Amino acid sequence: MPILLDPVRAPALDALLASANTQGLDWRIEAAADATLPRIRGIGTLASAGPEEISFLTNPRYQSQLAGTRAAAVIVTPDAAQALANDPSAPACARVVCPHPYLLYARLAQWFDAARRPRLPASVHPLAVVAPDAVIEDDVRIGPHCVVEAGASIGRGSTLGPGCVIGEGSSLGPDCLLHARVTLYANVRIGARAILHSGVVLGADGFGFAPDPTLGQGAWGKIAQLGGVRIGDDVEIGANTTIDRGALEDTDIGDGVKLDNQIMLGHNVRVGAHTAMAACVGVAGSTVIGSRCTIGGAAMLSGHLTLGDDVHISGGTAVTSNILQPGRYTGVYPYAEHGEWQRNAAVLQQLSQLRRRLRALEKA
């Protein structure tokens, strides 16, 4: 990561840790008694960090990079700190000892991100269109070409990037950040501190159609989607992810849910608190996903299913039935050289026949 702060604004290590959000984390600084604590201008990896940056060690695979790091300070676990204290070849940099170094790194990254992007004053750009009855609370920033429709409300401290659309009756809680070109259809409700990346679309019609022979053989009649979308607090939604409105009830995304880019959630889907999904996941309508689940990239979930709490789906898995017990589930056919894959696929197609033959032999 490049150095983020100019030297004048760079805090000393202890001041940085005191001003960052370290709530719930125990940490201490270990440095030579006669050492002056360094000023920290940014964060870097062990390999790339310079003498004005802080780094971190969380994965034992990078232990070998520690001896050669040029970082001014390194975040390590108590066990790693003890090992370094007994290692004469250990780097002379300051050590920040914390049982959760990756989480502390995340908190410091948040601090630097906020420091390099100072909060802009509240304003409504002259090229924005805001309905007369829309409610805009204090300290809100609305960028150019935004549209805020009738009855919509924007919570205190929220920011709308250029080109965002907030549909009729939709609402944002406090301290939300919508990047450029986010679209909320009508009746979308979002809680506090949400982050929505560019291209997110919430509240488009669910894929609901009824066979309608009055329109012709094989024709479909549209089912009006009368529900909305509800998003909880502290939710982050990645670029170009779409969540459809419910048919009758709301599509519901719980507190703390994290959605990667290009995910599609169908109508009436419900996702429990603190569940995370990687890119390109597809969830068909009316499926219920529990709390604290993880779903790997490109996994596909059929409609009208239930996944219990603490279910973990590997990337690329197709889920076609309920999973009620916690645990990790994988349904990915392993890749192979193409010719070998074709031979294995041919065997798979004959499994039921081979099973019958085996049973017959066992009975003989």
UniProtKB/Swiss-Prot annotation:
- The keyword Lipid metabolism appears for this protein: yes
Q: Does the keyword Lipid metabolism apply?
A: yes
Annotated catalytic residues = 267
Question: What Pfam families does the entry give?
Answer: Hexapep, Hexapep_2, LpxD
Q: Which GO terms describe its molecular function?
A: N-acyltransferase activity
Q: Which domain of life is it from?
A: Bacteria
Quote the pathway field.
Bacterial outer membrane biogenesis; LPS lipid A biosynthesis
Return the Gene3D superfamilies for the record.
Hexapeptide repeat proteins, MurE/MurF, N-terminal domain
What the entry lists under InterPro entries is as follows: Hexapep, LpxD, Trimer_LpxA-like_sf, UDP_GlcNAc_AcTrfase_non-rep
- Recorded catalytic activity of this chain's protein: a UDP-3-O-[(3R)-3-hydroxyacyl]-alpha-D-glucosamine + a (3R)-hydroxyacyl-[ACP] = a UDP-2-N,3-O-bis[(3R)-3-hydroxyacyl]-alpha-D-glucosamine + holo-[ACP] + H(+)
Q: Which GO terms describe its cellular component?
A: membrane
EC number annotated for this UniProt entry = 2.3.1.191
Q: Which UniProt keywords apply?
A: Acyltransferase, Lipid A biosynthesis, Lipid biosynthesis, Lipid metabolism, Repeat, Transferase
Q: Which GO terms describe its biological process?
A: lipid A biosynthetic process
Q: Which family does it belong to?
A: Belongs to the transferase hexapeptide repeat family. LpxD subfamily.
Known partners and oligomeric status: Homotrimer.
Which function does this protein serve? Catalyzes the N-acylation of UDP-3-O-acylglucosamine using 3-hydroxyacyl-ACP as the acyl donor. Is involved in the biosynthesis of lipid A, a phosphorylated glycolipid that anchors the lipopolysaccharide to the outer membrane of the cell.
Its name, as the record gives it, is: UDP-3-O-acylglucosamine N-acyltransferase
According to its UniProt entry, this protein's organism is Bordetella petrii (strain ATCC BAA-461 / DSM 12804 / CCUG 43448)
Q: Which gene codes for it? A: lpxD
